[in-house]
A protein has these predicted regions:
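Structural transition elements
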Residues: 350-387, 405
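Gly/Pro-rich hinge or "lid" segments in bacterial periplasmic/extracellular proteins
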Residues: 102-106, 197-255, 259, 378-379, ...
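Surface-exposed binding/hinge segments that line
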Residues: 127, 163-210
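N-terminal lobe/hinge region of extracytoplasmic solute-binding protein
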Residues: 67-119, 150, 224-228, 536
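Extracytoplasmic/peripheral linker and loop segments enriched in polar/acidic and small residues
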Residues: 326, 374, 420-431, 436, ...
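Ligand-site clamp/hinge motif
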Residues: 217, 247-293, 420-422
Length: 545
């Protein structure tokens, strides 16, 4: 196999085709077919509801009313945000990072106008744009990137994303516009998971002066970044709503909108009603229950993109009998995913057999092309339940309002297994606290707005992963995950992820359920929206009013 030349990851643009060439250089012929599928899957997003998009000169001004589907945003410090919906739907509005994604999940410049990667994959050199500023007027220089890095790795700060920076052995600034990161070993997803706008929360630049003057707790609630919109602290409430103001100093030109009013709407049905009534102009994510209904509304446009997420039912290994693999497998095999998708999600998602989302087609294997021990088989599930002694058990599914429908379907299905499943619905902040503390029997969760399969695997299935609150430990999986981070050969990475998938299917840290389709919706007078899967970039949006 030829030696990998990591320098092809240098910017100012890294396309998916470059990733193909990287693999081809190592003789990965079979990868070409998968990349063709990936190119098709990540073509510019389809307009699910076909409307004539009015052409014309963008208009400046106005306020976009943005309905955001969550009960409460716990915090907005990018290095602390642990909810993918917030990372994808809010952070890209307030923060810029070194690089960003295009619609095909290729990498393009953001704060860094270009970057180079050494042939051995160990040295990343970023050249910042000249004249960058934070929202508070402070200049953004290389020293601020260094501050952001040092803050994220500080054990006292306790960023859940510090692991994405663990490979860095030195961070240097030869001058005000140059940042050099040296890694101890190649880290394949470094640009995507550490340096990108939205998912790359670990290195998303924040204002040092604002952080030091405000303190960590206040900065959580009113952050200062360098993105297209600044956070308006006055009157802000992360449980009800807040305002974002167009940033005149944004490097790519002031956004067309004057303001974005973010309204927190917890209940899915309330979100749908708000969009139809015109109370909001846009929903970050259209609930599955409302997609068909909104598609029929001639005043609305829906845009769909391939999802990068997965959802599963996690069973807490620290709470018997769910430490018993037979008990977990019994539950996994008793869930009819096709029925779950049709009944709870109106047929929109695709069944999941693991944590590799369809958007990552270079590694994704459709369920009908492989076998999984978690496949629905009620007879086998009943035999396992009897053997494990769980008939009559009363586990509780902990969820949020968005989880109610799938939780109810799962509860009903598992009555056939002799389980009396309870449902506990919590608002987001309480759910988040108990999730991270491992204080639950079962939980519906998974990864959202992934920049690379590393996000949805390392965080959940590495023994020390930040989201592994159900205490899953498998040394073989740990070793394979470390290996995925160290290789630049996409075919090799895909094979490693397939090995991991086989193991976690059998271990059942999650009963894997489905992959969602990313659907956003807005009124027809919202123009200029550029869709990137599970991320919201709104600086190009304007209102035709």
């Amino acid at each position: 196999m030829a030696r990998i030349n990591w320098s092809v990851l240098s910017g100012p643009r890294v396309s998916r085709r470059t990733l193909l060439n990287l693999a081809a250089a190592s003789g990965a012929a079979a990868y070409a077919g998968r990349m063709a599928i990936a190119d098709a899957a990540l073509a510019p997003p389809s307009i699910a509801t076909r409307r004539a998009i009015r052409q014309g000169e963008p208009k400046t001004g106005g306020t976009l009313n943005y309905g955001f589907g969550i009960s409460q945003i716990p915090n907005l410090d990018p290095a602390k945000v642990n909810l993918g919906v917030v990372a994808g739907g809010i952070l890209p509005l307030i923060f810029s990072s070194l690089v960003q994604f295009d619609a095909q999940l290729g990498l393009i410049p953001d704060l860094a106008e270009e970057w180079t990667v050494s042939e051995d994959g160990l040295v990343y050199t970023f050249t910042l744009r000249d004249g960058l500023t934070f929202h508070n007027g402070d200049p953004l220089k290389a020293e601020d990137i260094i501050f952001t890095y040092e803050r994220a790795i500080d054990p006292d700060f306790a960023s859940p994303h510090a692991n994405k920076l663990a490979a860095i052995t030195s961070a240097e600034m030869p001058d005000d516009l140059t940042v050099v990161f040296t890694l101890e070993a190649p880290f394949a997803p470094f640009l995507a998971v550490a340096c990108s706008r939205g998912p790359g929360r670990a290195l998303t630049p924040v204002s040092p002066r604002a952080f030091e003057e405000m303190g960590a707790e206040q900065f959580d609630l009113a952050p200062v970044g360098a993105g297209p919109f600044s956070f308006v602290a006055e009157g802000a409430d992360l449980s009800s709503g807040f305002q974002l103001a167009a940033f005149d100093g944004y490097y790519n030109g002031r956004p067309f909108l004057d303001q974005i009013d973010v309204t927190i709407i917890a209940e899915p049905s309330s979100r749908i009603s708000a969009l139809e009534a015109g109370d909001v102009d846009m929903l970050d994510i259209v609930p599955a229950i409302g997609v068909a209904q909104l598609q029929e509304n001639p005043d609305l446009t829906l845009v769909q993109s391939p999802g990068t997420s997965w959802l599963g039912l996690a069973m807490n290994w620290a709470r018997p009998p769910w430490d018993n693999p037979e008990a977990r497998m019994a539950v996994a095999k008793a869930i009819n995913r096709e029925d779950l998708i049709q009944t709870a999600m109106f047929g929109l998602p695709t069944p999941s057999i693991g944590a590799i989302a369809p958007a990552f087609a270079w590694a994704y294997i459709p369920p009908d092309q492989t076998e999984t021990p978690q496949a629905f088989n009620l007879d086998e599930a009943k035999a396992l339940a009897e053997s494990a002694g769980i008939v009559g058990a009363q586990p509780t599914i902990m969820g949020t309002p968005d989880d109610q429908r799938p939780a109810e379907v799962i509860r009903n299905q598992l009555t056939d297994l002799g389980l009396d499943v309870q449902i506990e619905q919590l608002q987001q902040a309480a759910w988040n606290e108990r999730w991270l503390a491992g204080d639950y029997d079962w939980i519906l969760n998974g990864s959202v707005a992934d920049a690379d399969p590393d996000d949805g695997h390392w965080n959940f299935f590495f023994s020390e992963g930040p989201w592994n609150s159900y205490k899953y430990v498998n040394s073989e999986v740990d070793a394979l995950l470390l290996e995925t981070r160290a290789t630049g050969d996409q075919e090799k990475r895909a094979d490693l992820y397939h090995q991991i998938q086989t193991i976690i299917q059998q271990d059942v840290p999650h009963a894997f359920l489905y992959h969602t389709v990313d659907t956003t919706g807005f009124s027809n007078d919202v123009q200029g929206y550029n869709a990137v899967p599970e991320m919201r970039f709104l600086e190009t949006v304007w209102l035709d009013r």
